[in-house]
UniProtKB/Swiss-Prot annotation:
Main location: cytoplasm
Localization per Swiss-Prot or TrEMBL: Cytoplasm
Species in which this protein is naturally found: Ureaplasma urealyticum serovar 10 (strain ATCC 33699 / Western)
Residues the record lists as binding ATP: 8, 49, 52-54, 115-117, 158, 168, 206
Protein name: Holliday junction branch migration complex subunit RuvB
CDD domains: AAA
UniProt comment concerning the protein's domains: Has 3 domains, the large (RuvB-L) and small ATPase (RuvB-S) domains and the C-terminal head (RuvB-H) domain. The head domain binds DNA, while the ATPase domains jointly bind ATP, ADP or are empty depending on the state of the subunit in the translocation cycle. During a single DNA translocation step the structure of each domain remains the same, but their relative positions change.
Amino acid sequence: MKTNNEFRPQYLKDFIGKDQLKSNLKIYLNATKRLKSSFDHTLLHGLAGTGKTTLATIIANEMGVDCHMTQGNLLNKPVDIINLLSLIKENDVIFVDEIHACGLAAFETLYSVLEDFCIDISIGKDFNAKMTRLKVPHFTLIGATTMLGKIPEPLEERFGHVFYLSEYETSEIAAIILKNNQIHFQINLNDQEIDLIANSAKGIPRLANRLLKRVVDFKINGFDNIKNIFEKIQIYDFGLEEQDINYLNVLYQQENEIGLKSIAQILRLDQYTIETKIEPYLIQHHFINKNLRGRKITAKGIEFLKNNQLIK
């Protein structure tokens, strides 16, 4: 079975959707190549699965350089930054996913590195220790985050580009599904089936590719009716999944607002997953309301549960 990496486009010409962003990126990349410099440090923020890692890879490929990938929670101390910088060559890309999770000491180390391309290190111990400034190759830091508000302001100010990746249009998702099916599977899918998958993907390419792979699995095993397939894998109207239904049921059982901590305890999920993976779509489509007192299901959310006989 294909992995998510195999679905990722490698160059701008292959990237579907986000036309304005692609147009601007093409201009910035062309200018950078003419100036023979490194691409400006870039911050990508938005929901998970909207193409942040893909764009980082594309920028590196378009520049003809290597892309070194790491996670923010792995960068806690200055030595973590030093070790990462020891791997790069001139104009390489460093991609830090969930960059908001870096430790404070790592953030502070990055500030001078991003501006001056040098790093201060301590050589020796105790009273014999001396600070030495080392130059590092010019490079591009690309940070990705689902929580822009947790990025320290001094770090955010050092990014030359800040791009927001919102949900994709349904037509863009349909085009992604069509292309990936043609390239990787060649399974018979009509327009109606592609539209159903696209409408269930919540505007997220990663989710669209996951649904496509599950549909392919069932089609190969003789299941032709896509609605039956969705029933089997528990995909409901609007693309809601089992964890969405469980979340809505928790709110349905409450007369008043309920707090995030209580929801997490009932569902046995971490608060971060709820805030970043479940709630945004439910809020956007008016299934729930969120305020300072907590979360409450809306009339639309109640109607959805009742119409689909999903009340637990």
